[in-house]
């Protein structure tokens, strides 16, 4: 009996822990883990297959092979448990101890651990302050290192070759100094380090030195040494004296059939180490010559290196099959390593997979599960039921019963499955809607049935897709699956809050067809009393679906909510002019929605809006029911409509021939011009591509116009146009299938095709698919098609990698509190570009929390108080009262440490309410950005040719009526003709309405002519400014006579004759094409006043100097009188090289990796006045003198165009040299808010181009994570090192601690890290190691003696705990609270006991004596 009880004891309680620490193991520690030394390289005996004693699989060291049975068989069974057999020395216990018992090898010579040697930066090198090369020479016995110089002039840790050593021995005599080779030498050096003293020394040197490089070097070394000091790890432990041996079950040797064995590579590696070690021991005993011993020691070092990390140094060790052996390091790193394969990617019990088919009869929360699959998945539940019902007495009997599939089993299965949700998953699971829970409905057959409306979320179709089924087993799991994951509870996309259950294809077509109207349909103009009358008329064929009729329709308006919160509705009957189809459809409308939402043709977008409105007005349940009804009606009506397409539906426009002929003629004209040398080949190509592009568009337009309308006769007998009922047009117009571009290929012309490299082939395909392609045309079109397929494959991999990096950087961001109480936020405006509103203010602030009160601009009353979550009604209100800027909370300015607060995040888009505590918003953000990644292009766009020419604007006009206002940055001068010429680079014109609210804003480029004044009232359509689109002018801001400097023909400028006009102009030559002597000269012009003095910039003593950049055409002569606003030179924009803009996925990755772009813009570091200093070789020197008179210098490459000129006042962060912005500069000069604006806008631009909607807050969450580290500037009294990078929350905690003690806090600068870098530099080493660069991360963590607090999700998954998010957050909080209270209780009890013992001690004694007497 006792034995049985002991068995129960063996199931150990898993330990509760809050952190995991990693460190270096001392030799003593390794010996303490070990159960014995492995002395022989043998594994198992080839005849008996029993492990050899003292070998790598020794049962004495590692434990028995069979449960409770010693090796020789003397002791068997449980009763001998714990006995150690005296014959074979094996302890009688469970065989699974062979998974946990370790052995060790006593190394005859110490060896260095390769990770600390070779993983860059070399940790050994840092501690010893030696170069890696030197240490390697010592370790591999090529050089000596001085350990103890004694009285000689040698220095400690000096390296010398063998010859040197012998020479020095002769010089100073043997034994006067100690020098050693190999790991022993390094170990002695490490032992000799006095860490405390070193730290003091370095700190002193840090204070003293001024050089940047030295500070960096010292700081690095200091960090490592302080880590050693703090963690109590001794540096000499980086050298191994004892090698631990992995438990044998983790490096198994398994017999294959045919007498061969398969073994883990580790056994080979261990065997090599043991062989060499034993040989070395023997050589040392034999007192072999030094050179032989040295060689053996080197080989031992190499063997140990290979075991730890094969191939890290020198050639990798290979096995019998010439393949490099897989070492310990390879076991844990990479996709197939321990972390990603086994800890983060586990396989799941109780799962199955099958093909999916459509289940049109299912409700939204159901799925069809094949009976056989369900029987297998729910087996344990069925067994249990069979036993409780008494049908089967044992599990074995129950199994038999189930396998015979008797009717009673099916009944039980029905019962078991009732209300037990299952989870369906479709790979790739790109966002949280890729796994949803459904209630299973048992079906015959072998395919899973899926509801059509959830296909959009799963991105599933029925062309052979497969899905996996998982069964949640525990009650908690079932409950969570039902409440959080049930398909009917997930009707919105978490990425943007739009409904995910939108009908598509057939359903859309059916609904569209039903809600279209037509002129002069059967029964037009009839009036009906109610909908049943309409249905009766329709069934008797008195009216047709699209006929326009009048019907009395009952709508239900929301009156109020009663005590239970149920809505009360009041019916309202109105006569509506509508169509038969819409009236019939209105029967399924939920109460609370007006009929007007249906009284229009329902295209896909409209249906999406309809479901969205239903969700916001009527709630989740009604919406789901409504969506299901829409689906049923749509299918039914699509079937009734009987829409089909025939070749005749593709109408080829009659104008096509003419358009193509005209285009061909134009192309011939250009060819002629090219032949006669008037245009270059590139220009000809650009124009040809342009012409064909335009022709294709024209044909397409003509075709759409023809498809779109048809002529019909109305009731008066007149012929009128109405929207066409052409099947193809209806499909495209409704959004059911196809698009205008696809129809254009069917019935217009296919147009231009691209080569695989993305360049456009200049001969277009003039045919369409209806006419058919000839062989050449077919061949050209295969190009593009093939590239498309190759692109898709690449895109998927790249997109997946981006998602992985995003998830990794945000995985620990969870909503941990409701409100952090910050008063910071960001001011949101509508997004306007080129005068067009791209994103309205209402869309940007929906679902955010206000920071400040929103004030009605007309009455100045508070319309919405601070701290309000803006829902649809409130943004509508903001829109109506005309507020154009709202300050809202943002994840970026949230003050919560180690997480986010609900108020800063705002609405949980997937649920439509304020986010709950415990929501893993980081992962959701990562998924929302990564999931549409596959839809983005891989292309880098070539601007140039067709693309750019269409986009060049040369004027800007107002779209709204209002008043013109110029921004503060706008500067302009009036020229001789009285025109206003803009001389600012970043000026904008705003147009405001009567209340002074901004309606639109336009950038006005430098050199433009303004046609309006500041404060002028204008009508819509008024031109605001015009400019020359093809050249960029250089405008004079002063009046005077020109005086050229360095403008020498044939040196800095060249004369160009215009062939057509015969006029000559001077063009500035590229510095690279000049002779060496003249390279540094800049052509420029100064202005002289009437007295011949140089014109100065007002308020300074700088002369006005205007530099001409390369390629500028100088339009004035030397000594010419110029006026303010006159053009001095023009720079042709055509001569700017065609830039590649990175688009699509690479651009998103570039932004999130925070890469500095090539040729980045230079921004002004300070606010001040500019002037040019003396030029250096190939560089211009720009000086900005700030307001205090300090000069800041910039060196700018000669060929760059400097946007400022002498004496101009620039603001901090203003662009000085054109180019793409560098996010790091934006952060440094303009702050976090500007940076976030920049990244959000840039990322959104890429997605918007593809028509993907992502909410801004997801991108902000990622930016928050990119900004989570700071760099220490001034240490104050904190524990940090100058220039150290630390987590923001860690710094704030430390500063709080220091301030509380009344000391000086540290100051810091914000750091922007790319997502890969941010993931690797996270405080959790477990998370970082499982992401990338496993070796480096673990090496660093071990030396630092890091502790992982298991804050993020990933670390907890890896150690196998509940994640601290969702329901797990509450669990962990409760657990921590419980532990704290238990600790307090224990302490209280201890104190109580103590107090009892102290005071009444004598009394206790007395009573004892008394008792004794009585006894």
UniProtKB/Swiss-Prot annotation:
InterPro entries (alphabetical): DNA-dir_RpoC_beta_prime, DNA-dir_RpoC_beta_prime_bact, RNA_pol_asu, RNA_pol_N, RNA_pol_Rpb1_1, RNA_pol_Rpb1_3, RNA_pol_Rpb1_3_sf, RNA_pol_Rpb1_4
Residues that coordinate or bind Mg(2+): 461, 463, 465
Binding site for Zn(2+) 1: 70, 72, 85, 88
Principal EC category: transferase
Cofactor note: Binds 1 Mg(2+) ion per subunit. Binds 2 Zn(2+) ions per subunit.
Primary role: DNA-dependent RNA polymerase catalyzes the transcription of DNA into RNA using the four ribonucleoside triphosphates as substrates.
Name the UniProt record assigns to this protein: DNA-directed RNA polymerase subunit beta'
Species in which this protein is naturally found: Cupriavidus necator (strain ATCC 17699 / DSM 428 / KCTC 22496 / NCIMB 10442 / H16 / Stanier 337) (Ralstonia eutropha)
């Amino acid at each position: 009996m006792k034995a049985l009880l002991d068995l129960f004891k063996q199931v150990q309680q898993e330990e509760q822990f809050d952190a995991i620490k990693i460190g270096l193991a001392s030799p003593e520690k390794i010996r303490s883990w070990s159960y014995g030394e492995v002395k022989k390289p043998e594994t198992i005996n080839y005849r008996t297959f029993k492990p050899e004693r003292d070998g790598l699989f020794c049962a004495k060291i590692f434990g028995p092979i069979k449960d409770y049975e010693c090796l020789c068989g003397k002791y068997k069974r449980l009763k001998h448990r714990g006995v150690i057999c005296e014959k074979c020395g094996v302890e009688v216990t469970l065989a699974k101890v062979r998974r946990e018992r370790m052995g060790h090898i006593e190394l005859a010579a110490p060896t260095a651990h390769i990770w600390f040697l070779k993983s860059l930066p070399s940790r050994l090198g840092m501690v010893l302050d030696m170069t890696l090369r030197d240490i390697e020479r010592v370790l591999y016995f090529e050089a000596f290192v001085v350990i103890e110089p004694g009285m000689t002039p040698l220095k400690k840790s000096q390296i010398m070759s063998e010859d040197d050593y012998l020479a020095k021995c002769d010089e100073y005599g043997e034994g006067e100094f100690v020098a050693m080779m190999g790991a022993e030498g390094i170990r002695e050096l490490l032992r000799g380090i006095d860490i405390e003293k070193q730290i003091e020394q370095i700190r002193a040197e840090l204070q003293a030195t001024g050089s940047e490089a030295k500070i960096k070097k010292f700081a690095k070394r200091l960090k490592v040494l302080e880590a050693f000091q703090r963690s109590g790890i001794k540096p000499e432990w980086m050298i191994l004296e004892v090698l631990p041996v992995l438990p044998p079950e983790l490096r198994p040797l398994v017999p294959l059939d045919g007498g061969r064995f398969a073994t883990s590579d580790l056994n080979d590696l261990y065997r090599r180490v043991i062989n060499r070690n034993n040989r070395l021991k023997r050589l040392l005993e034999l007192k072999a010559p030094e050179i032989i011993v040295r060689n053996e020691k080197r080989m031992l070092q190499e063997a140990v290196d290979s075991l730890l990390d094969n191939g890290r140094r020198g050639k990798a060790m290979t096995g019998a099959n010439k393949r490099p052996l897989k070492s310990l390091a390879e076991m844990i790193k990479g996709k197939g390593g321990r972390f990603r394969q086994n800890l983060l990617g586990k396989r799941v019990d109780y799962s199955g997979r099958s093909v999916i088919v459509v289940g049109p009869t299912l409700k939204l929360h159901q799925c069809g599960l094949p009976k056989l699959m369900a029987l297998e998945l729910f087996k344990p539940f069925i067994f249990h039921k069979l036993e409780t019902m008494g049908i089967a007495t044992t599990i074995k009997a129950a199994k038999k019963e189930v396998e015979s599939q008797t009717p009673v089993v099916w009944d039980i299965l029905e019962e078991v499955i009732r209300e037990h949700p299952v989870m369906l998953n479709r790979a790739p699971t790109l966002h949280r809607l890729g796994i949803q829970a459904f209630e299973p409905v048992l079906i015959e057959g072998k395919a899973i049935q899926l509801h059509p409306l959830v296909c959009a979320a799963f991105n599933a179709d029925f062309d052979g897709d497969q899905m996996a089924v998982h069964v949640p087993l525990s009650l908690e799991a079932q409950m969570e699956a039902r409440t959080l994951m049930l398909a009917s509870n997930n009707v919105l996309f978490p990425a943007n809050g739009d409904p995910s259950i939108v009908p598509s294809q057939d359903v859309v077509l059916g609904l569209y067809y039903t809600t279209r109207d037509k002129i002069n349909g059967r029964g037009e103009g009839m009036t009906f009393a109610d909908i049943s009358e309409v249905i009766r008329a329709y069934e008797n064929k008195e009216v047709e679906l699209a006929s326009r009729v009048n019907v009395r329709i009952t709508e239900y308006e929301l009156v109020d909510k009663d005590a239970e919160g149920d809505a009360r509705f009041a019916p309202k009957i109105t006569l509506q002019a509508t169509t038969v189809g819409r009236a019939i459809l209105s029967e399924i409308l939920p109460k609370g929605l007006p009929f007007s939402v249906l009284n229009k043709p329902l295209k896909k977008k409209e249906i999406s809006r309809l479901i969205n409105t239903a969700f916001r007005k009527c709630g989740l349940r009604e919406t789901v029911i409504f969506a299901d009804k829409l689906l049923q009606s749509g299918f039914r009506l699509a079937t009734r409509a009987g829409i089909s397409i025939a070749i005749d539906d593709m109408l080829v426009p009659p104008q096509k021939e003419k358009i193509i002929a005209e285009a061909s003629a134009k192309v011939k004209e250009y060819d002629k011009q090219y032949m006669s040398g008037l245009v270059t080949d590139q220009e000809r190509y650009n124009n040809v591509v342009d012409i064909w592009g335009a022709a294709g568009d024209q044909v397409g337009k003509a075709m759409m116009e023809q498809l779109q309308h048809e002529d019909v006769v109305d009731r008066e007998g007149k012929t009128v146009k109405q929207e066409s009922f052409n099947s193809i047009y209806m499909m495209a117009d409704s959004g059911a299938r196809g698009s205008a571009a696809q129809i254009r290929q069917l019935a217009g012309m296919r147009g231009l095709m691209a080569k695989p490299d993305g360049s456009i082939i200049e001969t277009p395909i003039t045919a369409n698919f209806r006419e058919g392609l000839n062989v050449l045309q077919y061949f050209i079109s295969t190009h593009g098609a093939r590239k498309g397929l190759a692109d898709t494959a690449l895109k998927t991999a790249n997109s997946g990698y981006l998602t992985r990096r995003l998830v990794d950087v945000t995985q620990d961001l969870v909503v941990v509190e409701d409100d952090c109480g910050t008063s910071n936020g960001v001011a949101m405006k509508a997004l306007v570009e080129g005068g067009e509103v791209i994103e309205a203010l209402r869309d940007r602030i929906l679902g955010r929390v206000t920071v400040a009160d929103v004030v009605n601009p007309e009455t100045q009353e508070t319309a919405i108080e601070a701290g309000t979550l803006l829902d649809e009604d409130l943004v509508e209100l903001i829109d109506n009262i005309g507020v154009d800027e709202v300050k809202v909370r943002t994840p970026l300015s949230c003050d919560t440490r180690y997480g986010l607060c609900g108020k800063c995040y705002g609405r949980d888009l997937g649920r439509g309410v304020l986010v709950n505590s415990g929501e893993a918003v980081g992962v959701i953000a990562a998924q929302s950005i990564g999931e549409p990644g596959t839809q983005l292009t891989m292309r880098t766009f070539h601007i140039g040719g067709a693309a750019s020419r269409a986009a060049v604007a040369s004027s800007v006009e107002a779209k709204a009526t209002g008043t013109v206002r110029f921004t503060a940055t706008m500067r302009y001068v009036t020229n001789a003709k009285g025109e206003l010429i803009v001389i600012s680079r970043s000026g904008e014109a705003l147009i405001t309405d009567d209340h002074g609210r901004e309606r639109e804003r336009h950038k006005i480029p430098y050199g433009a002519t303004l046609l309006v004044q500041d404060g002028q009232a204008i009508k819509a359509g008024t031109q605001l400014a015009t400019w020359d689109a093809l050249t960029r002018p250089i405008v004079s801001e002063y009046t005077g006579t020109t005086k050229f400097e360095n403008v020498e023909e044939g040196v800095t400028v060249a004369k160009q004759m215009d062939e057509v006009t015969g006029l000559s102009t001077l063009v500035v030559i590229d510095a690279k094409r000049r002779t060496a002597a003249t390279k540094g000269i800049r052509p420029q012009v100064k202005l002289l006043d009437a007295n011949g003095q140089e014109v100065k910039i007002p308020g300074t003593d700088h002369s006005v100097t205007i530099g001409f950049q390369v390629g500028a055409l100088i339009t004035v002569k030397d000594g010419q009188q110029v006026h303010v606003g006159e053009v001095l030179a023009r720079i042709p924009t055509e001569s700017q090289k065609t830039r590649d803009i990175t688009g699509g996925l690479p651009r998103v990755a570039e932004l999130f990796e925070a890469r500095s772009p090539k040729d980045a813009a230079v921004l002004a570091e300070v606010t001040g006045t500019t002037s040019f200093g003396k030029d250096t070789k190939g560089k211009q020197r720009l000086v900005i003198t700030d307001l205090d008179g300090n000069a800041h210098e910039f060196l700018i490459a000669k060929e760059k165009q400097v946007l400022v000129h002498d004496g101009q006042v620039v603001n901090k962060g203003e662009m000085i040299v054109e180019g793409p912005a560098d996010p790091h500069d934006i952060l440094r000069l303009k702050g976090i808010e500007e940076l976030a604006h920049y990244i959000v806008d840039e990322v959104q631009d890429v997605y918007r181009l593809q028509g993907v909607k992502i909410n801004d807050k997801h991108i902000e969450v990622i930016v928050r994570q990119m900004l989570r580290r700071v760099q220490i500037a001034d240490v104050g009294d904190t524990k940090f090192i100058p220039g150290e990078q630390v987590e923001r929350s860690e710094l704030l905690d430390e500063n709080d601690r220091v301030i509380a003690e009344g000391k000086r806090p540290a100051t810091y600068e914000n750091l922007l890290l790319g997502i890969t870098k941010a993931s690797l530099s996270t405080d959790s080493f477990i998370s970082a190691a499982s992401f990338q660069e496993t070796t480096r991360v673990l090496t660093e963590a071990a030396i630092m003696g890091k502790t992982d607090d298991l804050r993020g999700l990933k670390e907890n998954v890896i150690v196998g705990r509940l994640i601290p998010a969702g329901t797990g957050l509450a669990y962990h909080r409760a657990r921590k609270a419980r532990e704290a209270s238990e600790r307090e209780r224990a302490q209280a009890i201890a104190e109580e006991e103590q107090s009892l013992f102290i005071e009444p001690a004598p009394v206790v004694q007395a009573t004892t004596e008394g008792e004794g007497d009585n006894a």
